[in-house]
């Protein structure tokens, strides 16, 4: 039986989703809701898009990037609520739900991080990693979702495969 893993790099504008089967990367998608300027509309749209992606991929295991404390409380609430939407999907579909800290997944795949490494540099590293490993030219949201998947597989083996 196949083991399906979905990894999510969520944000309030664009979220990357990656799909792995039996420990092998299969595909990714970008959920873009940046056209919605109102945060409540954006949340509803992003929630529905993530729900549809989960329905399509039918994962056994989900890893979503843990929300980190931000200066923007509105964005923090958005991401925390979005995590709840993913958790609810998992509960309703007998799917294992997990979060992973950005520092953990970056460390697992050998990314340089620390006080002197800026956010944009971290995103560039993710894009470069995916280009070098998979030959894919993707944006940072998709890249980070793929990186999260690779890190999970490296940290925990083939997660049920």
Label each region the model flagged.
Residues 1-161:
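Phosphate- and other anionic-substrate recognition elements at nucleic-acid/protein interfaces
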